[in-house]
């Protein structure tokens, strides 16, 4: 059993994710091997909130070049978490 700190890597703050906060949705980068149930339990334990829904998506790493050498960024998994009305996550406060 992994700890919540191993499942949730960090909050993802972008222009789109700050717009979703108006709908009580928060975006996180999560461990690629984590499933929706693990993500839900980790968010509820870390932030003491009630999660209604979890949407996940895998984002493929982009190709990057340095001179004549080509590489690829790592793949990553995002989770968009919908909270119960009235619940807020303090990490995101002040960003709206």
Swiss-Prot record:
Domain of life: Bacteria
Gene Ontology, cellular component aspect: ribonucleoprotein complex; ribosome
GO MF annotations in UniProt: rRNA binding; structural constituent of ribosome
UniProt GO BP: translation
Swiss-Prot/TrEMBL keywords: Ribonucleoprotein, Ribosomal protein, RNA-binding, rRNA-binding
Cited Pfam families: Ribosomal_L23 (PF00276)
UniProt keyword Ribosomal protein, yes or no: yes
Residue spans crossing the bilayer: none
Similarity remark: Belongs to the universal ribosomal protein uL23 family.
NCBIfam families membership: PRK05738.2-4, PRK05738.3-2
Subunit relationships: Part of the 50S ribosomal subunit. Contacts protein L29, and trigger factor when it is bound to the ribosome.
PANTHER family in the record: 60S RIBOSOMAL PROTEIN L23A
Function according to Swiss-Prot or TrEMBL: One of the early assembly proteins it binds 23S rRNA. One of the proteins that surrounds the polypeptide exit tunnel on the outside of the ribosome. Forms the main docking site for trigger factor binding to the ribosome.
Name the UniProt record assigns to this protein: Large ribosomal subunit protein uL23
Organism from which the protein derives: Moorella thermoacetica (strain ATCC 39073 / JCM 9320)
């Amino acid at each position: 059993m992994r700890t919540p700190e191993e499942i949730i890597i960090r909050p993802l703050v972008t222009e789109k994710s700050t717009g979703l906060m108006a709908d009580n949705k928060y975006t996180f980068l999560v461990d690629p091997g984590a499933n929706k149930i693990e993500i839900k339990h980790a968010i509820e334990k870390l932030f003491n909130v009630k999660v209604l829904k979890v949407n996940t998506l895998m984002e493929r790493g982009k190709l990057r070049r340095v001179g004549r050498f080509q590489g690829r960024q790592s793949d990553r998994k995002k989770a968009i978490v919908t909270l119960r009305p009235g619940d807020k996550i303090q990490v995101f406060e002040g960003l709206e």
